[in-house]
């Protein structure tokens, strides 16, 4: 798949990031990971991002990364495109991106480089080096220490034909509008704030109708229903799901740092698709929080 074909796919529909399955010892569990992908693929997501943030990319070893991407690509071939997460130091991000390309992924999501602050010039150099190390499409994730402005993205768009997308996990409306207006149709734009459904209607109004859903991992039907409601401007359905599910869900998620991933694994466990524990430094939900989440999920009905 060439970068422009991938860009077209990512320009509409719902996206998601499968959890990474671990056993009780914290080791990658390939068989249930494959079954997870087989379960999720038919629900209609435009693309799935393997070993992304929700997939605990930041906790994976290189050998595990290769196995995860291979399982994802092999399992979903002909069903749904797989993009791989990559990130960290520039040379590591390059190595992972090249490995993902070798294994047949359709593209990569470039996560932040972590820890150190960087100038716009440094961020441009980092992203440019990753883009030029591969032929397939690259989506850059604006989040944490990687906050590219419109000037920097314009430079990258000119220098890197395979930079096809910009995912926003910052939520700076002025910056997002500036980037969207400046870059126009050169990139595809993805909403990427945690629990993106809460912000979906606002991002759609800015010209960013596509977003990634974490809750797709355990309530895929509801996630797709919500996306369609936003797309069709069914404000009644959007408001009801936000009030009945997403705001109470946020109340649980916001109780502890790192729960953005933990609560998704908890949800998967509750619906019978257990992905195992999160890896340290993340922590799993407490028993009473599991009960509260279970009650929210049951109100939604069958998935």
Curated annotation (Swiss-Prot):
Regions that span the bilayer: none
Top-level taxon: Bacteria
Pathways per UniProt: Carbohydrate acid metabolism; D-glucarate degradation; 2,5-dioxopentanoate from D-glucarate: step 2/2
Disulfide bonding pattern of the chain: none
Gene Ontology molecular-function annotations: 4-hydroxy-tetrahydrodipicolinate synthase activity; 5-dehydro-4-deoxyglucarate dehydratase activity
Keyword Cell membrane belongs to the record: no
Phosphoprotein listed as a keyword: no
Family annotation (SUPFAM superfamilies): Aldolase
GO BP annotation list: D-glucarate catabolic process
Catalytic activity: 5-dehydro-4-deoxy-D-glucarate + H(+) = 2,5-dioxopentanoate + CO2 + H2O
Keywords: Lyase
EC number: 4.2.1.41
UniProt-listed NCBIfam families: KdgD, PRK03620.1
Membership in a protein family: Belongs to the DapA family.
PANTHER family in UniProt: 5-DEHYDRO-4-DEOXYGLUCARATE DEHYDRATASE 2-RELATED, DIHYDRODIPICOLINATE SYNTHASE
Record-given protein name: 5-dehydro-4-deoxyglucarate dehydratase
